[in-house]
Amino acid sequence: MSNHTHHLKFKTGKRAWKPSKYFIVGLSCLYKFNLKSLVQTALSTLAMITLTSLVITAIIYISVGKSKAKPTSKPTIQQTQQPQNHTSPFFTENNYKSTHTSIQSTTLSQLINIDTTRGTTYGHSTDETQSRKIKSQSALPTTRKPPINPSESNPPENHQDHNNSQTLPYEPCSTCEGNLACLSLCQVGPGRAPSRAPTITLKKTPKPKTTKRPIKTTIHHRTSPEAKLQPKNNTAAPQQGILSSPENHTNQSTTQI
């Protein structure tokens, strides 16, 4: 700010000095030629010019100072805020680094815990599978239930065909006591034991067929007006015709069926 004001003062003084310099040179020339009256008038005019120039420079200086007085407050505010701006990123970077390292450490610890828990779960599962395999190998072959298919296209009757043949283990005849089924299936000795166990085929029970009975339909015929007029002509016939009418109707209905 101070440099700028000094520069403006120097420019205004330089502009006022040029005409005054030429004026002084002219006055000196007139003084040599002994023109006192002219010199006095010139000196008076020069004094007036210098006074006016000084007044003009003072006015310019005051106006420039007022116009530049307002922005002078802003640099002071910026200077007070600059140290805060310089120091805040340093602290934020340190905070970011510390938080980043803490997050990484927590994630790594969580991953390690997950891996250990997975290892334990896998260990339990492998032990369970091995125990199941040993149990299945040690157990004797038993009747297996047919698998349940959720689809409706395969009916459950197809599964019974696969399970009709059942394999039985080797049993000696000495264990059978009065059981005819056991005697028919047992072997006398181990030497005669067949390569394959005998199979029992179960016969399917046929389903009872349902026969639909025919439904009887009775048709009632209306008597014609000619039949009603016949009793008037014959005196004995009307009673027979009236009595025989329901029998005739039943005979007609049975014949039509």
Swiss-Prot record:
Key words of the record: Disulfide bond, Glycoprotein, Host cell membrane, Host membrane, Host-virus interaction, Membrane, Secreted, Transmembrane, Transmembrane helix, Viral attachment to host cell, Viral immunoevasion, Virion, Virus entry into host cell
Record topology, Extracellular segments: 67-257
Bias (Basic residues) ranges: 204-222
Name of a matching Pfam family: Glycoprotein_G
Compositionally biased region (Polar residues): 73-95, 231-257
Domain of life: Viruses
InterPro entries in the record: G_prot
Record's GO cellular component terms: extracellular region; host cell plasma membrane; membrane; virion membrane
Disulfide linkage: 173-186, 176-182
This protein's record includes keyword Glycoprotein: yes
Family, similarity comment: Belongs to the pneumoviruses glycoprotein G family.
UniProt-recorded name of the protein: Major surface glycoprotein G
Annotated source species: Bovine respiratory syncytial virus (strain 375)
Gene: G
